[in-house]
Amino acid sequence: MTTAHILGFPRIGAQRELKFALERYWRDGASADAERALVDTGRALRAEHWRIERDAGLDCVTVGDFAWYDHVLTTLAHVGGLPRRFGFDARALTLADYFAAARGNAAQPAMEMTKWFDTNYHYLVPEYSPATTFGPGVEWLFDEVREARALGYRAKAALVGPLTLLWLGKARDGLVERLALLPRLVPAYRALLARLREAGVDWVQIDEPIFSLDLPDAWRDAARPTYEALAPGAPKLLVATYFDDASEHAALLKALPVAGLHVDLVRADAQLDAFVADYPADKVLSCGIVDGRNVWRNDLDRSLARLAPVRDALGERLWVATSCSLLHVPVDLAHEPRLDEELKTWLAFAAQKTREVAALRDALVKGRAAVAAEFDDAAAAAAARRTSARIHNPLVKRRVAALTDADARRASAYSVRAAAQRARFGLPLLPTTTIGSFPQTPEIRRARAAFKQGVLDHLGYLEAMREQVRIAIDKQLAYGLDVLVHGEAERNDMVEYFGELLWGFAITSNGWVQSYGSRCVKPPLVYGDVYLPEPMTVGWASYAQSLSAKPVKGMLTGPVTMLQWSFVRDDQPRATTALQIALALRQETLDLEKAGIGMIQIDEPALREGLPLKARERAAYLDWAVRAFGIAASGVADDTQIHTHMCYSEFGDILPSIAALDADVISIETTRSNMELLDAFETFDYPNEIGPGVYDIHSPRVPDADEIERLILLALERIPAQRLWVNPDCGLKTREWRQVDAALAAMVDAAKRVRQKVEEAAPA
């Protein structure tokens, strides 16, 4: 019979149970009681997620999709591959060790973190050196298999594949080629797979999303011998590709000695023909037709029409699946009691998507009539969404159509603007600032919760937030920072805040997804044309500026990041939606400028994240992304300084486009990579000002002034002092004030030391 399965389920829990359990564990100092509570939470979550999968009608549950922090880190733990610098015993790895690798400890900084392909999920980057070894690791996967079997479930295991695991890492300490480690890694996988077979696992899903990339020949050539080594003695292997078109590798993948392949038909529907043609008789083909990355309800009739010919060709060897893991969508629409009822009928979260997969399987096997009610309901929702008047705003469409190239460019060149800004602000060499947010304290959270519950009235909430702004300004003045921020106490999220105030956006109550570790975000839903009805940030920025003579930056989230970190409508091009958001932000920048705010930061941390995986598609994306930023930023006068911020990015390959943004100042995350990101600036003469991060805010570890001074000096080897800023890697929302106080004081101290050295070294 045709099999229905998913590639993975969200691990955080419907009420973010994993997040809160992790934070209690860390807060309690990883005590034995705290660890027991954490382990119990994980076990309960897995059982609940498997129950949802079973109740939806899936033919198997997926084990191995759970991770305490990150699935790449967990895979490294399974094959004994955590960085050697931590000195951990791979076979005796504890949870405390695991979290030390993720978050750093007193002896070692945390592992580097970056985006998982083109998603908003972050993985921990493996570190590979000539001394790297692999072997037996933790027992967690086998524990999960035993749990699932004890509950009576048929379990399919899921693992990040060996080629993808190597591809995602960084070569260090003189290692020339990561593939050189493959002969060491394959035996570790082979042993892991053999044990899974002994444990009674019939199928193992091996995730190899790198086959959706433009792979070098050496990596393509490594695929067949790798799987020839893995297949003997293993359970049946399902090699899963997703996130883009893998058809250029179709012949290679179909020739692998595995039992099946998975392809993503949501992101690359056209690839199906290349796989179905001459498909091997000994393989299943898993078709990912339910979107694992967006929240819109599946058009079941359309999907059935797409799958029916495949069913005719392959029979029971057709499997129905989600396009990728459901890690990227919220858990359950049932937990959205306050969401607009019409909008709700257009949506499907993870729990609903599992049922969509099973319903498609049922229609293929039993006929549409067997699930007619579900199909008819989905068809009615799709028709209503196509014709809903709430989606379309004629005024917005006219404004987008009227945009010209001049609207996306500043009136004067950077050199002219820089002179005007120096005259206006009079900043010292190596000016110090922060990225925007300060700690979201319990006081802030209590006030926000009381306001949302109606316990605190609007005026009381404003007063509470103003007090937090005053605290943030006073602290920054005490540190000695040169450019201040208001701290964003009023914002629960850098995208959701704006989504609450813009027309065309909707906000969920419980639509959380994991960003990394315990960090969860609640992406807004962009369901219709975007319009700014009134100023969003002017009152907060103006109040903060009234508290100090030093400049205070206005803080906005850029159009591409708003797009990338939301669940975006799929009925028009993303470029069009980006321009709509950009027009709204342009009006906000003009309102800020009119209110006397002389520096405005438009954050674009997701610019590179939106880059298509295929090289041939990138130029078009960068063109509209740069244009959208320009529309948002270019209406202001020469002496208004536009900042932007980018984090978690390796962007050497898009530096020309970053330069084309023409922001007066850009700040970037560089600490975890030890300023390696700045290597690109040795060959590309970035024309404007730049602030490479000198403090890793993702780790609780507090750097001292000597460490920060070393990083500033490293930056000065690549960036002229006249164009260098000093700032943390990212916003400080997730840190505690005691950490921030120490780190920013050290940062200002380090900047003053280096400033003195530079000035003393300058010719008289």
Swiss-Prot record:
What cofactor(s) does the depicted protein rely on? Zn(2+)
List the active-site residues.
698 (proton donor)
Q: Which GO terms describe its biological process?
A: methionine biosynthetic process; methylation
Q: Which UniProt keywords apply?
A: Amino-acid biosynthesis, Metal-binding, Methionine biosynthesis, Methyltransferase, Repeat, Transferase, Zinc
The note describing how and how many cofactors are bound reads: Binds 1 zinc ion per subunit.
Give binding positions for Zn(2+): 645, 647, 669, 730
Task: Give me the residues that bind L-methionine, please.
Answer: 435-437, 488, 603
Task: List positions binding 5-methyltetrahydropteroyltri-L-glutamate.
Answer: 16-19, 115, 519-520, 565, 609
Catalytic activity entry? 5-methyltetrahydropteroyltri-L-glutamate + L-homocysteine = tetrahydropteroyltri-L-glutamate + L-methionine
Q: What is its EC number?
A: 2.1.1.14
Q: In which pathway does it act?
A: Amino-acid biosynthesis; L-methionine biosynthesis via de novo pathway; L-methionine from L-homocysteine (MetE route): step 1/1
Q: Which InterPro entries match?
A: Cbl-indep_Met_Synth_N, Cobalamin-indep_Met_synthase, Met_Synth_C/arc, UROD/MetE-like_sf
Q: Which GO terms describe its molecular function?
A: 5-methyltetrahydropteroyltriglutamate-homocysteine S-methyltransferase activity; zinc ion binding
Family, similarity comment: Belongs to the vitamin-B12 independent methionine synthase family.
Instruction: Briefly state the protein's biological role.
Output: Catalyzes the transfer of a methyl group from 5-methyltetrahydrofolate to homocysteine resulting in methionine formation.
Please identify the protein, giving its name as recorded: 5-methyltetrahydropteroyltriglutamate--homocysteine methyltransferase
Q: What is the protein's species of origin?
A: Burkholderia pseudomallei (strain 1710b)
Species lineage, top-down?
Bacteria, Pseudomonadati, Pseudomonadota, Betaproteobacteria, Burkholderiales
